């Protein structure tokens, strides 16, 4: 369902660049791909999320248990993410992708490049200094805050704020339902804005016609 919806409305997306981020979600019960995450001091699942420049969620990786970091099985995760875009007839070749320092690894960069994607990854201090040959466009990276806003949007939906399901497919389905709601909400807002502009333009034209001076 989600891939078809994404394909149908792909013209509404802003693919000038995309953002990638990992997100841990707490689980109230046990279940598939659930594990203890020390930083959150609770059981979580971890998934990677990709958004467009507007912050609209595009796809996610198959979640893994919470004890794993964002680079766990990164080849599989990137193949899943870029594969979904390709299924939706959204070209990935030439995309610029922002990611935080947690993705600063040779494997991740190589995986992106193998799909034709340019990784704009913040340098991790533990991997050395900033005088490196890898790509990092600061001006582009500063736009990454938008995916943090998307995380806040997602958290406003109780169905994905905390995991109550025990099956992985159910949890993924809830995420894609939220993706669809956010996309359709954005489309509706855009249509309302366009209609408002057209009405304003039409009213302005009528007003101008009413006040056109007549010179006999």
Describe the residue ranges of each PLM region:
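Short alpha-helical elements
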Residues: 1-216
